[in-house]
Regions:
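Soluble "head" domains of membrane/secretory-pathway proteins
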Residues: 2-17, 36-42, 50-201
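Hydrophobic membrane-insertion alpha-helices, especially the h-region
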Residues: 18-36
Length: 201
């Protein structure tokens, strides 16, 4: 008679081994999804009011970023999209690691803030246009006195709460954001349940 295998003689070890494999698969699968498909973020601070609020749970779509990188390109979001990106000024313990803002302008465009109005100038609009008109704006004047031309490989972003110092963004100290720091566009507000909402992607 053939000798029983080790696992046959120790069935509990077989069960434990199967459980370990399952846990490893779950961890690896979660990491892959977070890296390449979507990620979840929580909003902190008032910078995106009246659109997003502290405690809102967001789903960020990683797929367009992943597809761009697979083609050896940088991902460029659309004007007006709400995006999450790595904070260029981040240092442990002093700043938020990731920020959420709205895309205002792209490389080569000139952005001005004057008398409470944000204006973008480009080849298509040499006299300038107000991007806030496309999404009903922040609902309040834009603070600051700014004039900047967006450098290559970067975007100009701003919060929706632009009065005073509620939003650190490209107007007032954050600077323009490198495309390689963009994590992805916000596709869904998942929480609170009473405010579930999809966003432009």
């Amino acid at each position: 008679m053939m000798e029983a295998s080790f696992l046959t003689r120790h069935p509990r070890l077989k069960d434990i081994g199967g459980f370990v494999v399952f846990v490893v698969c779950v961890i690896v699968g979660t990491l892959l999804i977070n890296t390449f498909v979507f990620r979840s973020f929580s909003v902190t601070g008032p910078s995106m009011e009246q659109t997003l609020y502290t405690g809102d749970r967001l789903i960020v779509n990683r797929l367009p970023v992943t597809m761009a990188h697979l083609q050896n390109n940088s991902y460029t979001p659309k004007r007006g999209q709400i995006i999450v990106f790595k904070n260029p000024l981040y240092s442990p313990g002093s700043e938020d690691m990731n920020l959420v803002k709205r895309v205002i302008a792209f490389a080569g465009e000139r952005v001005t803030v004057k008398d409470g109005t944000l204006t973008v100038y480009n080849k298509e609009h040499p006299q300038g246009f107000h991007p806030d008109d496309s999404w009903d704006g922040p609902g309040s004047p834009t603070s600051g006195d700014t004039e900047v031309t967006v450098p290559e490989g970067s975007i100009f972003v701003a919060g929706d709460h632009r009065q005073g110092s509620y939003s650190l963004d490209s107007r007032n100290g954050l600077g323009t954001v490198p495309l390689y720091d963009v994590i992805g566009p916000v596709s869904l507000r998942l929480w609170p349940l009473t405010k579930v909402q999809g966003f432009q992607i």
